[in-house]
Regions:
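The conserved beta1-alpha1 loop
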Residues: 2-6, 117-118
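Active-site machinery of serine-nucleophile hydrolases
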Residues: 4-60, 152-162, 166-169
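Soluble non-cytosolic domains of exported or imported proteins
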Residues: 42-49, 86, 123-127, 185-190
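Primarily recognizes the serine-hydrolase "nucleophile elbow" in alpha/beta-hydrolase
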Residues: 67-111
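C-terminal catalytic histidine-bearing segment of alpha/beta-hydrolase fold enzymes
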Residues: 114-116, 127-130, 139-203
Length: 203
């Protein structure tokens, strides 16, 4: 599982924060790439090629099934993962984006997508997450109107997608008034666990 950090941070710090290996529990490699600058290239090929190189290096060094590479991105890393899923779906089996918007893109190919977003996020507005899920539903040939799939986590799923693709959107409505405002821009641990469970169900 490739896990892409937001801007002005790095893979090591992101690992200390998100600790996705705690949710994977030894079932997969968790990798936290570093961007080459303060942010990712979310419109061009620079970081798409970089991701391909990372996957090549990992499969040469370890026993990794290239047909089961997943990508998770948070914030600006989420923008990259949207871009990766759109332009290079051959590299990943499925993608998940937390609190990350998606610039309008064309020429995307279908693949399974999970989008999660905090209701209280003021950095990346919840509507942007919903819009990203709707765009992927269009790419994947799904229905326009989603149906509730997991009420406890605020999840809805778009039906009728081109097999084997799916699109799920989960809105995290949790609010703690004691939290600093910036803490509302995150993927809470409960939704990190949900993300790994979702990856495990991808056909």
């Amino acid at each position: 599982m490739l896990t892409f950090h937001g801007w002005y941070t790095n893979g090591r710090d992101f690992q200390k924060w998100f600790k996705m290996e705690d949710h994977v529990e030894g079932a997969a490699f968790t990798v936290y790439p570093d961007s080459k600058g303060p942010t990712w290239d979310v419109v061009g090929n620079t970081d798409l090629d970089f991701t391909a190189d990372v996957i090549d290096a990992l499969t040469n060094a370890y026993c990794i099934d290239r047909t089961h590479v997943f990508a998770l991105g948070f914030s600006y890393g989420g923008k990259l993962v949207h871009h990766l899923g759109c332009k290079r779906p051959d590299l990943v089996r499925a993608i998940s984006v937390g609190d990350g918007s998606w610039q309008e893109e064309t020429g995307c190919r279908p693949l399974p997508v999970l989008v999660t977003h905090r209701t209280r996020d003021d950095d990346e507005l919840p509507a942007w997450g919903r819009n990203a899920a709707q765009r992927w539903a269009k790419v994947n040939g799904c229905s326009d109107v989603p149906e509730e799939s997991d009420a406890a986590h605020g999840c809805v799923a778009y039906r009728g997608c081109k097999a084997p693709t799916t699109v799920t959107f989960c809105e995290d409505r949790h609010f703690d008034p004691t939290w600093p405002k910036e803490w509302n821009h995150t993927i809470r641990e409960e939704y990190r666990s949900l993300t790994w469970s979702w990856f495990n169900r991808v056909p």
